């Protein structure tokens, strides 16, 4: 792990604000510039933390959980008062938490769900196609992740509005609002209370565990013992967040690109078989999330003198755009191959729902282009995006409509 021959005598220090609101695209430009200046650096934001910027170093950190622990995954919060399960666990317990869920989120299970997901995506596009304009973030990107999540869990659509409301409040923590953290904390509590009540109901009135995720989890084992209710609730909160807010953000960026790049949009209309490849490229070129790790012991990481309990931002956002790995890394090439991006992480903690997310991202493009093949971004001024989890605040789109007889 030590490689001091090319390391500077003293690691660089900087103050990089990666959480503020800025014009769309600015966050990646800043990350790209930092990566080319520093292989790693100490960021003086909050309590201070290391930032790894290069693809190979980041993969190594993901693959070394005995040094880079998941006990905290937010760089500015080394000792969180809440738990994301199974995200906040390391091997070997991590796989014990994931094991009951693996089959549910497997490629085969997602394929069986795809016809229902397509229906839901089509319904959301049909609801706005005749309007000729929409804020994509407040319409499709708001609703489809919720309906897709409820469908994937085997839940009815009755509570869709509740989940949309909670998702709004939980997504505001890095958007700059004065009360954002308080609103997010309150929404977290509301979501935990919801799943606590739902779990109690499933224990009293179980449904078919082959189609109802919560019934399946109510019987889940942690090794040889029943999984505690508090752990099941924490898992449900984590799955909710991962299914709603992150998917909404990624949906926004792929449509932002297609609304600004008519040649790519026309090519996907003419060659829809390229849409899966385009989704992978949008994930690579517009990576929205970076993970953090907590150092378990003093270590020299390729010349970087990390101390026990230091926080490290393991920047997927930087790795996915590293020109040492990706030719023309700053360009979007919708048929790029190979494409070894790590937008979903790497190693054991790779995103559990990645197959579901890929299907939803693909179906969103397929169904939109089927009804609205010609559209563009309407904003005259640069759009704004919040940092942290990089997400557009709005995305106004316009398109020609066909008069109905």
Label each region the model flagged:
Residues 1-405:
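Cytochrome P450
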């Amino acid at each position: 792990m030590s490689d001091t021959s090319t390391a500077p005598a003293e690691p660089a220090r900087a103050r990089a604000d990666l959480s503020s609101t800025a014009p769309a695209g600015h966050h990646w430009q800043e990350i790209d510039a930092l990566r080319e200046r520093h292989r790693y650096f100490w960021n003086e934001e909050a309590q201070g933390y290391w930032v790894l910027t290069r693809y190979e170093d980041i993969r190594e950190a993901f693959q070394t959980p005995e040094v880079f622990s998941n006990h905290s995954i937010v760089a500015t919060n080394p000792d969180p008062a809440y738990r994301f399960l199974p995200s906040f666990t390391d091997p070997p317990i991590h796989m014990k938490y994931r094991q009951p869920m693996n089959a549910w989120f497997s490629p085969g299970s997602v394929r069986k769900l795809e016809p229902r997901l397509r229906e839901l995506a089509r319904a959301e596009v049909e609801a706005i196609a005749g309007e000729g304009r929409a804020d994509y973030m407040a319409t499709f990107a708001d609703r489809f992740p919720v309906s897709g999540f409820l469908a994937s869990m085997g839940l009815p659509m009755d509570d869709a509005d509740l989940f949309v409301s909670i998702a709004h409040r939980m997504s505001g923590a890095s958007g700059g609002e004065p009360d954002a953290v308080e609103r997010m904390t309150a929404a977290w509590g509301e979501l935990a209370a919801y799943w606590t009540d739902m779990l109690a109901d499933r224990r009293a009135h179980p449904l078919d565990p082959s189609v109802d995720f919560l019934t399946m989890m109510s019987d889940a084992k942690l090794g040889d013992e029943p999984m505690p209710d508090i752990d099941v609730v924490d898992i449900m909160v984590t799955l909710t967040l991962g299914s709603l807010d992150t998917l909404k953000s990624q949906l926004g960026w792929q449509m932002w690109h297609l609304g600004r790049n008519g040649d790519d949009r026309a090519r996907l209309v003419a060659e829809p078989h390229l849409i899966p490849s385009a989704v992978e490229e949008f994930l690579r070129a517009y990576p929205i999330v970076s993970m953090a790790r907590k150092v378990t012991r003093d270590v020299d990481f390729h010349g970087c003198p990390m101390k026990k309990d230091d926080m490290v931002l393991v920047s997927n956002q930087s790795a996915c755009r590293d020109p040492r790995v990706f030719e023309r890394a700053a360009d979007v090439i919708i048929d790029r191959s190979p494409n070894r991006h790590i937008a979903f992480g790497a190693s054991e903690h790779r995103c559990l729902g990645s197959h579901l997310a890929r299907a939803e991202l693909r179906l969103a493009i397929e169904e939109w282009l089927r009804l609205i093949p010609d559209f563009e971004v309407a904003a005259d001024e640069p759009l704004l995006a919040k940092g942290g989890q990089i997400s557009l605040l709005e995305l106004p789109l316009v398109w020609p409509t066909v008069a109905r007889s």
